[in-house]
Amino acid sequence: MASKRALVILAKGAEEMETVIPVDVMRRAGIKVTIAGLAGKDPVQCSRDVVICPDASLEDAKKEGPYDVVVLPGGNLGAQNLSESAAVKEILKEQENRKGLIAAICAGPTALLAHEIGFGSKVTTHPLAKDKMMNGGHYTYSENRVEKDGLILTSRGPGTSFEFALAIVEALNGKEVAAQVKAPLVLKD
């Protein structure tokens, strides 16, 4: 069986932990991850001034699709940039139409709202993004640290990044693989 594939869309101002932790955990699970730079292949400055080098531009990565999951990290500016991108809208619409998994964390789910993705789903966000996410009544809000409703998987923030990443692994590769990846991470239960 071919390994699963993930597209992580990296925008300027993305939250570092919400980008790197899911990438690392998914790669540990054997998922082929592509970090795609929204603005190209140049290094991206994240919300706390960590610089991440994308594997490809979003334009080039899109040509290699479809992906088993599209991941949207948070960070206020990063989420705003994802929300304003026509390319992100196109990728999310294609992913939704083909019934592929979409995962977003922290403020990242607000890009789902901006692009009208997953309406009717139960979601969670960073507490500061809750009001924005609930504007218009398109979603049901959950206070859970990670919420999976069908093919929409959301999480709350930097402190839930490992749980978010492991939920993606479980959705793509099953509980057993997620447990195998989790064990050596020495996470608190």
From Swiss-Prot:
Q: Which NCBIfam families match?
A: not_thiJ
Q: Which gene encodes it?
A: PARK7
Residues making up the signal peptide according to the UniProt record: none
Query: GO CC annotations?
Result: cytoplasm; cytosol; endoplasmic reticulum; membrane raft; mitochondrion; nucleus; plasma membrane
| Glycyl lysine isopeptide (Lys-Gly) (interchain with G-Cter in SUMO) crosslink location in chain | 130
Looking at the UniProt record, the site noted as Cleavage sits at 149-150
**Where are residues bearing Cysteine sulfinic acid (-SO2H) located in the sequence?**
106
**Biological process annotations from GO:** autophagy; cellular detoxification of aldehyde; cellular detoxification of methylglyoxal; cellular response to oxidative stress; detoxification of copper ion; detoxification of hydrogen peroxide; DNA repair; glucose homeostasis
Q: Where in the cell is it found?
A: Cell membrane; Cytoplasm; Nucleus; Membrane raft
Phosphotyrosine PTM positions: 67
Identification of the protein by name: Parkinson disease protein 7 homolog
